């Protein structure tokens, strides 16, 4: 199985793709702009293109696990969102997730699409707690697209990171 993680970095010419509240250079990765129709259409076209090129049932070495973002609840460390509330951040992410899901499933009905969460389940050290974020994401998904089968890519690091005695 091949997995692919989709991340949005900074490019001065493409800042319209970044969520308006997150347009600050120098962050690791950025929250996608789902408030602007041109940005949404750009992501929709991009997702369709890459899923056609890299996914699909007809390829032996195809991408079958698609991950949108990295530890999206840690929106100060990874998917920078610029101070969005948990609900706004999760809903914005869910809208982007739905675009990717539709593109992926259009080329491969067996492929899986994942939300990526960090190890901070109850405390949001770098943004929002994983549980609260996932609850908001799930509520939006079930309200707007209950047929979508989504998956969780959970990063179970020790907390704190430097204390890994199990």
For every predicted segment, state its role.
Residues 106, 136-166:
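Glycoside hydrolase catalytic-domain groove-lining segments
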Residues 1-127, 159:
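Substrate-binding cleft and catalytic face of glycoside hydrolase catalytic domains
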Residues 122-136, 163-166:
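Active-site glycine- and acidic-residue-rich loops that bind
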């Amino acid at each position: 199985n091949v997995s692919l993680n989709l991340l949005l970095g900074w490019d001065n010419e493409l800042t319209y793709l970044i969520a308006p509240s997150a347009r600050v250079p120098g962050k690791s990765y950025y929250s996608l702009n789902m408030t602007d129709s041109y940005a949404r259409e750009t992501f929709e076209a991009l997702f369709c293109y890459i899923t056609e090129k890299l996914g699909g049932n007809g390829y032996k070495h195809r991408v079958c696990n698609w991950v949108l973002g990295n530890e999206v609840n840690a929106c100060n460390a990874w998917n920078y969102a610029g101070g969005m509330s948990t609900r706004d951040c999760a809903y914005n992410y869910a809208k982007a997730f739905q675009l990717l899901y539709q593109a992926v499933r259009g080329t491969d009905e067996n492929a899986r699409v994942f939300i990526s969460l960090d190890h901070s389940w109850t405390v949001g050290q770098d943004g929002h707690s994983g549980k609260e974020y996932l609850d908001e994401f799930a509520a939006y998904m079930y309200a707007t697209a209950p047929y979508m089968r989504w998956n969780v890519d959970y990063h179970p690091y020790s907390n704190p990171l430097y204390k890994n005695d199990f």
